[in-house]
Amino acid sequence: MGRYFGTSGIREVVNEKLTPELALKVGLALGTYLQEGKVVIGCDTRTSSVMLKNAVISGLLATGIDVIDIGLAPTPLTGFAIRLYNAEAGVTITASHNPPQYNGIKVWDRDGMAYTPDKEHELEKIIESGNFRRVPWNEVGTLKTANPRKEYIEAILREINLKGSYTVVIDAGNGAGSIVSPYLHRELGNRVITLNSDPSGFFVRELEPNKESLSMLEKTVKVLNADIGIAHDGDADRVGVVDENGEFVEYEVMLSLIAGYMLKKYGKGKIVTTVDAGFALDDYIRELGGEVVRTRVGDVAVAEELVKHGGVFGGEPSGTWIMPQWNLTPDGIFASALVLEMIDRLGPIGELAKDVPKYVTLRKKIPCSNELKNKVMNKIADLIPREFSYERIITIDGIRIENDDWWILFRPSGTEPIMRITLEAHTEEMAERLMKKAENLVKSVIKDLSS
C-alpha cells in the first residue's frame, strides 16, 4: 500500500486523514496525470461526500479537465457513465461498506476498471511533489451535470431477461443503491418491497451485508413469503442475498452459484477469485468444467486477472462481483438482476445451494494500527512454521497456509486499521481450534510489538 491509497483507493476517517485539502490534491494530481479529456464523478450518501466531491472537482477543473458530475450515484453507475460519456476516467466518493465516519476516493480508468497500484503510485508521486498542472483562466475545465440512471437501467434490461415475475425485498442500507436498484427490479417485472431505502448518510444498519446485519431482511422475506432478498452496501458495489426461506446465503455459496451460472450462460472458461476464497468454489467449478484462478484481494486485482486470462467471471467472497461481459467495475446492482435471472432459469436459491460443497468458514477482525501492520506480518511469517504444520503456502496477498482439509489466511486490511484472519475447515471443531490458535498468535504478536 502507498501513503494514501490502499486496496480500494483512499479510505480514511473524514476530517482526520481524509480532508477537503487532500481531496483537492487528488483532483489536481489526477488532472495533471491525465493532461486532457473528461472525468465522470459521483458520490454515495455519506454526510461528507458532497464536500469531498466538490473539492476533487475543483482540482480537476484547475488543471483544465472537463468534469461530468452525476451526483448521488452507486459506484457501478459511475463505471457505466465513464463509457457512456466517453470519459478518460471516473471518480467515486465512497467508503463502500465502512462505518459512516469514513469516506474515500476511488479512481477508475476509461474501461471502468479501478486504477491499478502503479497508476495510484503515479498520483501519489504528483501529490507529494506538489507539481500540479494549473491552466490559465481561459482554459479552466467545464462542469456539467448529468443523470445516466435511465440509460443504465435500460442497458441492464437489454442484458437480463426474466420469463417470470418475483417478489423481491431490497435492503439498500440507506446507500446510493436505493436510487437505482428498486427501480431496476420493478422494470424487470418484479414486485418490490424496500427496506432502508432512504438515501441518508446516517445508516440504520451495519453497511457490510452479512447475516448479522441483515436480520430484518431475513424476517421480511420470510413474513412476506418473498422469492428473494437483496442487500447492498453503501455504494452498491456488493450484493448480499437472502433465499426464499428467509436465510442469508453465505458469500462462499453465492460466489460458487453465480460463477457456475456464468459458465452456463457464457461458456466454459476461467473464474477469477481472491486468496480469501475457499475450497467450495474450486470443487463446484471443477465439476462444471471451469478453472479457478486466484489473485490478491481487491476488485482491481480481480479485474486485472480477468483481462489477462479472458475470464468469464470474477468475484470475491464479500459479495463483490465483476461480470466482464458487462463492465470491469464491480456491480452489485447488475449482479442482483443476474441472480434473479439465475432463479428464473434454474430454480430457487435454497435448492440450488444444496449442490455447493459445504465447509466451515470463520472470519475474525483484530484491531491493529496501520503503522504496525508490516511488522506484525513479518513476525507472523517467522512464527507460522513453528505454530502450524501445513503443506502449501501462498504469499501473493498476506500469508495463506493450506492442507487438504483446511486453510488459514493472515492478512492486513487495506481499508481499516485491523488484521484479518480467514479460515476454512472440513469440520466445525477443526475450524474453531484453528481460529483460536491463529487468533492467539496474531494478538500476542501485536501485543509484543506494541509494548
UniProtKB/Swiss-Prot annotation:
Residue list for modification Phosphoserine: S96
Entry superkingdom: Archaea
UniProt cross-references to PROSITE patterns, sorted A to Z: PGM_PMM
Amino acids binding Mg(2+): S96, D233, D235, D237
Annotated TM spans: none
GO BP of this protein: carbohydrate metabolic process
Gene Ontology molecular function, alphabetical: magnesium ion binding; phosphoglucosamine mutase activity
EC number: 5.4.2.10
Annotated cofactor note: Binds 1 Mg(2+) ion per subunit.
Catalytic function, reaction form: alpha-D-glucosamine 1-phosphate = D-glucosamine 6-phosphate
NCBIfam families to which the protein is assigned, alphabetical: Arch_GlmM
Name of the molecule in the record: Probable phosphoglucosamine mutase
